[in-house]
Amino acid sequence: MTEQEICVRVTRAAAKRKASTAMGIDGDRVNKKRVVLGELLNVSNVNLLANLNQKKETQKPKRNLKPPPAKQIKSAPVAIIDLESKSDIDSRSDDPQMCGPYVADIYEYLRQLEVKPKQRPLPDYIEKVQKDVTPSMRGVLVDWLVEVAEEYKLGSETLYLTVSHIDRFLSLKTVNKQKLQLVGVSAMLIASKYEEISPPKVDDFCYITDNTFSKQDVVKMEADILLALQFELGRPTINTFMRRFTRVAQDDFKVPHLQLEPLCCYLSELSILDYKTVKFVPSLLAASAVFLARFIIRPKQHPWNQMLEEYTKYKAADLQVCVGIIHDLYLSRRGGALQAVREKYKHHKFQCVATMPVSPELPVTFWEDVTI
């Protein structure tokens, strides 16, 4: 594939500007929209060009992962945090999938699973394994996959699994930079089959790359990834822990804060853009997102407390490095050219959390042991 053949990045907003002239170009694809990967050979100069078509895809059925509203329960004053029974918060949920009586054992198992060597990528695989791939290229790829996931209405769990498959595969196999996009769409195909009710077809993933790769290319790479990962696809992700951590984080608010959960999701998706976060396990990334989200919402209060420490198993000091990286991502001091996640969370359906202000500095007192 020559440099001229490598397609340039197209965003949803740019595609809309060309929609009126593009409808008649390809009759068979009139309802599709390509989201084209940025230039990997020169990641510092990503041009924005309009795409051929604007897609109006029929919405696919979604699983309702959101629990029904919790019933009103009389409790002690908010300032008093009861640590006597760790099952209290879990037992309040009306969602039977939370498995209140067994949740502590379940999460203990998930913590053991997330640190297994087969489940973890190498923290420095780009330096040790890859010869042609850079951290910036990985960032461009993940940012583009966020757009693809939005285009095909894929869940965040699918996105996290996709990135996990990519990092694990690149920890084992050397890949030419011209094949990096192929690794990305094939990993997303695998994750979609694992997670989604109606996953996109192989043709859809070929089309989203502007037919840079054939069906045979995608299927062959899919097989290569599955063999390299030894078909071990299920693993805990950030979402696995975030569901529980956000419920604990809401406990000391007088009323549930509407922006807390989408803000945690935004910070979590920002975190996967940066190669430096590969070394962190999902539970630590989730806890760091909760820590920073609480700081953004209530900047004058300490974002951590004994209950969060008890449920997450992390002290504030354990989160310092990870929180610092995500904080820099939030302020665009890292990965500022990667805009897909930022644009996604500016929408009203996510409470416009990407526009919330935050202090440029984190107080050093945050990393001391909490006694509240």
UniProtKB/Swiss-Prot annotation:
Single Gene Ontology BP annotation: mitotic cell cycle phase transition
Keywords annotated in UniProt: Cell cycle, Cell division, Cyclin
GO cellular-component term (any): cytoplasm
InterPro entries: Cyclin, Cyclin-like_dom, Cyclin-like_sf, Cyclin_A/B-like, Cyclin_C-dom, Cyclin_N
One family name in Pfam for this protein: Cyclin_C
MF terms in GO: cyclin-dependent protein serine/threonine kinase regulator activity
Region (Disordered): 53-73
Entry similarity comment: Belongs to the cyclin family. Cyclin AB subfamily.
PANTHER family (UniProt xref): CYCLINS
UniProt protein name: Cyclin-A3-2
Species lineage: Eukaryota, Viridiplantae, Streptophyta, Embryophyta, Tracheophyta
GN (gene name): CYCA3-2
